[in-house]
């Protein structure tokens, strides 16, 4: 190394701006002070008063290193090439001498193939390489770190193991790939760390959490935690082999949506841990008859008020409730008890917190640089740049990570509409058209299709669900047929229309009958989930119970009738926690659900109703076999708006497998109400939301016999009593004499 290059390297190193420290530190040809010939070892220890070279084989002192610069650069000349010399550094700092391994004698953490595949966007197991990974190299325990930051001019690992000093452990740059890596001996699981970066202009950026970290500090702290993938011993083999049947379009899928932090609190308003949730939530879900739990996002997030929808640590289950293996335990226990686990997954945007992904290397790395493409103005968040290979790879690998490492059964993808449309929530002039001049986000579409192909191709029995609020076609149709490839789509239109209807005073419902019937015009164009989610019980919308009109009796009766309509309507079911017992106030993420309400009979009655509706849904094939098929449904009458009555049939696999559903959405009982019946003989009432068991007036029908009076296109009919504000379900009972 010539004197000029040596001087420049020393200045860059002590100034904490050297972009390639491995070219200078550690063992090298040449003299320690830059002369030609021979071999040397250099190290940089700013706080050291002396450094000696120690043989790792026999602990003998090989020589005292010379101070090459007053700021802490030391070096020693060797008579021959270090070769495979295993050495340590004995560092004197103050009154303490300690032996440390030299990170700069170890080779790269990432291989050339890994870097190439990341650049292509095809390294689907990239989380096994990027981030922090405990490992042993040449018999030395430590952690390998790897980060993608192509525009940074220096990247260092900082942590509680080096005093958060960015001068100590600058990383190796891999030109052309944007990857930086280093192996740090002695850094083990549990250590805290971040990355310190200099931007393209050499300015110091806010310290960044690791995008690929498997654990983070418990908020409000923001450091990453060194944590390996682990060797958790799963006990859910039977579930994993059978789970495909549990989420099929012909299966009775009933999902309980849960926010872990507020479902139930322990002592002193403390949220339950993952392991406590396993002991309390799972038995409750089983007792209530739900088939799956859907968790609001568990990926680490800084702001409690985002409910997890503004994540930063996409590969780290939030530390609010425990460690990663604690979350694995929760999922494992769910599976052992026959309950599936679906995660809300956020791939549409990320927050602007300084320690997160925004402006990561001093440039718009994960987001678009143009705010017309890269900013959600409504939410104050950034939009992922799906057209950048490394960003797409990051997200695809993350989706697969949860399914592989945590045995998650499905991903409910949040805010899909915001991903699909370039003009989503934007005025004219505030968005950039695609290359064809349209408003479709072609890169996001390609990303979603690829994600779905990978999920279904790699993980049999897993499912993806889209929260998509527009009329985008074929969301839940296969990619090879031109669809987006999701398994299911939330039916936001059904939810909005039916809640609008139920909020009307019964006097005016006759003018809004179409709000209940319109959904059947498109009910089978997608594989739908009917969602009453967390979004419907916040921000002044009131609780579901609070939207029901009338006095207390009518509110509860309305709610019971509505749930009866929902559970018998085509589509899978989703209910947010607390709605199953008619919580009266809006959901508050900082407070536990109001479990004390179950001391009141009306609330206890709604809880019993939901439990029994789940049992009905699972036990009557006609209510789930053909949930997504048009020939599993037929109207008897959807036009009796004057009396606010709806009647329809649900069919299973055989003509005899049929149920009749009748809804009366007024507080007036209807006596002598005639409806056509497809099967002659006796019909038994098998469910009635007006049952006294649920808090109703106990008006009903028990068993009715068909009469040979034509009605509604059928050769026979039944005459029913319709309870007030109620849904009833009937099915053939006994010998069938005629089907017509």
Curated annotation (Swiss-Prot):
<comment type="pathway">
    <text>Glycan biosynthesis; glycogen biosynthesis.</text>
</comment>
<dbReference type="GO" id="GO:0043169">
    <property type="term" value="F:cation binding"/>
</dbReference>
<dbReference type="InterPro" id="IPR006407">
    <property type="entry name" value="GlgB"/>
</dbReference>
<dbReference type="InterPro" id="IPR013783">
    <property type="entry name" value="Ig-like_fold"/>
</dbReference>
<keyword id="KW-0808">Transferase</keyword>
<dbReference type="InterPro" id="IPR044143">
    <property type="entry name" value="GlgB_N_E_set_prok"/>
</dbReference>
<dbReference type="Pfam" id="PF22019">
    <property type="entry name" value="GlgB_N"/>
</dbReference>
<dbReference type="InterPro" id="IPR004193">
    <property type="entry name" value="Glyco_hydro_13_N"/>
</dbReference>
<dbReference type="InterPro" id="IPR006048">
    <property type="entry name" value="A-amylase/branching_C"/>
</dbReference>
<dbReference type="InterPro" id="IPR014756">
    <property type="entry name" value="Ig_E-set"/>
</dbReference>
<dbReference type="InterPro" id="IPR037439">
    <property type="entry name" value="Branching_enzy"/>
</dbReference>
<feature type="active site" description="Proton donor">
    <location>
        <position position="467"/>
    </location>
</feature>
<comment type="function">
    <text>Catalyzes the formation of the alpha-1,6-glucosidic linkages in glycogen by scission of a 1,4-alpha-linked oligosaccharide from growing alpha-1,4-glucan chains and the subsequent attachment of the oligosaccharide to the alpha-1,6 position.</text>
</comment>
<dbReference type="Pfam" id="PF00128">
    <property type="entry name" value="Alpha-amylase"/>
</dbReference>
<dbReference type="GO" id="GO:0003844">
    <property type="term" value="F:1,4-alpha-glucan branching enzyme activity"/>
</dbReference>
<feature type="active site" description="Nucleophile">
    <location>
        <position position="414"/>
    </location>
</feature>
<dbReference type="GO" id="GO:0004553">
    <property type="term" value="F:hydrolase activity, hydrolyzing O-glycosyl compounds"/>
</dbReference>
<comment type="similarity">
    <text>Belongs to the glycosyl hydrolase 13 family. GlgB subfamily.</text>
</comment>
<dbReference type="GO" id="GO:0005978">
    <property type="term" value="P:glycogen biosynthetic process"/>
</dbReference>
<dbReference type="InterPro" id="IPR006047">
    <property type="entry name" value="Glyco_hydro_13_cat_dom"/>
</dbReference>
<dbReference type="Pfam" id="PF02806">
    <property type="entry name" value="Alpha-amylase_C"/>
</dbReference>
<keyword id="KW-0320">Glycogen biosynthesis</keyword>
<keyword id="KW-0328">Glycosyltransferase</keyword>
<dbReference type="InterPro" id="IPR054169">
    <property type="entry name" value="GlgB_N"/>
</dbReference>
<comment type="subunit">
    <text>Monomer.</text>
</comment>
<dbReference type="Pfam" id="PF02922">
    <property type="entry name" value="CBM_48"/>
</dbReference>
<keyword id="KW-0321">Glycogen metabolism</keyword>
<protein>
    <recommendedName>
        <fullName>1,4-alpha-glucan branching enzyme GlgB</fullName>
        <ecNumber>2.4.1.18</ecNumber>
    </recommendedName>
</protein>
<dbReference type="InterPro" id="IPR013780">
    <property type="entry name" value="Glyco_hydro_b"/>
</dbReference>
<dbReference type="GO" id="GO:0005829">
    <property type="term" value="C:cytosol"/>
</dbReference>
<keyword id="KW-0119">Carbohydrate metabolism</keyword>
<dbReference type="InterPro" id="IPR017853">
    <property type="entry name" value="Glycoside_hydrolase_SF"/>
</dbReference>
């Amino acid at each position: 190394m010539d004197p000029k290059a040596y001087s420049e390297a020393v200045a860059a190193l002590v100034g904490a701006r050297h972009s390639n420290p491995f070219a200078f530190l550690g063992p090298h040809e040449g003299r320690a002070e830059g002369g030609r010939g021979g071999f040397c070892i250099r190290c940089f220890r700013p706080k050291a008063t002396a450094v000696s070279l120690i043989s790792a084989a026999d602990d003998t002192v090989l020589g005292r290193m010379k101070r090459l610069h007053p700021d802490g650069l030391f070096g020693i000349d060797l008579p021959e090439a270090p070769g495979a010399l295993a050495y340590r550094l004995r560092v004197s700092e103050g009154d303490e001498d300690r032996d440390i391994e030299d990170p700069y004698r170890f080779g790269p953490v990432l291989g050339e193939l890994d870097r190439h595949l990341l650049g292509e966007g095809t390294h689907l197991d990239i989380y096994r390489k990027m981030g922090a990974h405990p490992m042993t190299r040449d018999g030395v325990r430590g952690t390998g770190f790897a980060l993608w930051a192509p525009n940074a001019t220096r990247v260092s690992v900082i942590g509680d193991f080096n005093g958060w000093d960015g001068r100590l452990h600058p990383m190796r740059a891999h030109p052309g790939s944007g990857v930086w890596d280093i192996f740090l001996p002695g850094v083990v699981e549990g250590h805290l760390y971040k990355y310190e970066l200099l931007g393209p202009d050499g300015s110091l950026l806010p310290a960044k959490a690791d995008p690929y970290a498997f654990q983070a500090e418990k908020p409000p702290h923001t450091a990453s935690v060194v944590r390996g993938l682990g060797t958790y011993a799963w006990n859910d083999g039977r579930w994993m082999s059978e789970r495909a049947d549990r989420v099929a379009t012909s299966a009775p899928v009933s999902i309980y949506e849960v926010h872990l932090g507020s479902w139930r609190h322990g002592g002193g308003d403390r949220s339950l841990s993952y392991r406590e949730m396993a002991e309390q939530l799972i038995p409750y879900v089983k007792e209530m008859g739900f088939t799956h739990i859907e968790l609001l996002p568990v990926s680490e997030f800084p702001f409690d008020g985002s409910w997890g929808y503004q994540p930063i640590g996409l590969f780290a289950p939030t530390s609010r409730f425990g460690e990663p293996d604690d979350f694995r335990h929760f999922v494992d226990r769910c599976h052992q008890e026959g309950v599936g686990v679906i995660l809300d997954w956020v791939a549409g945007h990320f927050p602007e917190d300084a320690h997160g992904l925004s402006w990561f290397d001093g440039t718009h790395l994960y987001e678009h640089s143009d705010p017309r493409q890269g900013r959600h103005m409504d939410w104050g968040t950034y939009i992922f740049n799906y057209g950048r290979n490394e960003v797409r790879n990051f997200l695809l690998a993350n989706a697969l990570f949860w399914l592989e490492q945590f045995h998650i059964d499905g991903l409910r993808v949040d805010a899909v509409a915001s991903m699909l449309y370039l003009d989503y929530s934007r005025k004219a002039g505030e968005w950039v058209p695609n290359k064809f001049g349209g408003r479709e986000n072609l890169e996001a579409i390609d990303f979603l299709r690829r994600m779905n192909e990978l999920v279904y191709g790699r993980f049999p029995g897993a499912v993806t669900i889209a929260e998509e609020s527009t009329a985008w076609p074929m969301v839940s149709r296969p990619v090879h047929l031109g669809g987006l490839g999701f398994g299911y789509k939330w039916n936001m239109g059904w939810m909005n229309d039916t809640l609008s209807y139920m909020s009307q005073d019964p006097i005016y419902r006759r003018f809004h009958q179409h709000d209940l019937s319109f959904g059947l015009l498109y009910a089978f164009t997608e594989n739908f989930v009917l969602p009453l989610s967390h979004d419907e019980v916040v921000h002044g919308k009131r609780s579901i119970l609070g939207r029901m009109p009338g006095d207390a009796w009518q509110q509860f009766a309305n709610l019971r009738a509505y749930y009866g309509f929902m559970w018998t309507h085509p589509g899978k079911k989703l209910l947010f926690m607390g709605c199953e017992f008619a919580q009266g106030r809006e959901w508050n993420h900082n407070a536990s659900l109001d479990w004390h309400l179950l001391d009141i009979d009306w609330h206890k009655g709604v809880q019993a109703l939901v439990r029994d509706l789940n049992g009905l849904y699972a036990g009557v094939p006609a209510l789930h076999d053909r949930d997504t098929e048009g020939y599993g449904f037929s109207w008897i009458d959807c036009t009796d708006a004057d009396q606010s009555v709806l009647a329809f049939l649900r069919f299973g696999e055989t003509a005899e497998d049929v149920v009749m559903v009748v809804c009366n959405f007024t507080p007036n009982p209807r006596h002598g109400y005639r409806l056509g019946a497809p099967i002659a003989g006796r019909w038994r009432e098998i469910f009635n939301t007006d049952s006294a068991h649920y808090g109703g007036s106990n008006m009903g029908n028990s068993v009715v016999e068909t009469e040979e009076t034509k009605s509604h296109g059928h050769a026979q009919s039944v005459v029913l009593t319709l309870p007030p504000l109620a849904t009833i379900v009937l099915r053939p009972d006994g010998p069938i004499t005629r089907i017509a």
